[in-house]
Amino acid sequence: MSQPYVTAYVPWCKKWEGCCAWFYLDTRGNVTIWVGFEVPSALAAQSLPLYLSGGTLACTVQEKAAAWETVSSMQPGRLSSSYGYSGCPVMLPSDGDALLMAKLDALDEGLAAGIPGFEALPDAWKMACLDQAFNLGLHGFLSGYPHEIDRIEAGDGLGAALQCHRNGISDERNAWAAAQFKSVPA
């Protein structure tokens, strides 16, 4: 079962990452679905729970693979909504959220293993760490932000807030993460 702070982070994750029920190309041109779930191949697409547009008829593996091929050949750099087409397979919210929760729970476990004392941190700090791990990847966060990790381990929220800025994301998202570290003393 997910920790309460993991569940509390879900709406923020959807806000920052966006949420799209069909395949689209992310900013790097990778086929993606729901909240930033990269689908690396047509074969990988076949294992996803996808439905025809009405949401009641499950797609065949052939339909899933064909949809992946269709979207992978489209022009990248557009809004995710522009990749939907008549009859495109969709992911139901219950299935997409189950995938999201599984990913967040795995990141939470990885953070607990990678940051000594993580379990005892304030929930707001854990949410900021989840956001960074979701955005950067667990390894990218743990290895790419050593000064921030040091400040977290030391219980220095202000120091962590000063170190948590990421390039390439919105100022609003960076400010939200910093505010989480500033909001509660360890």
Where are the regions that the model predicts?
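Acidic, aromatic-lined catalytic clefts of primarily extracellular/periplasmic carbohydrate-active enzymes
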Residues: 1-127, 151-186
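Short, solvent-exposed secondary-structure capping/transition elements
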Residues: 42-45, 138-145
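Amphipathic alpha-helical interaction surfaces
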Residues: 110-113, 135, 139
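Charged, low-complexity intrinsically disordered segments
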Residues: 119-136, 142-143
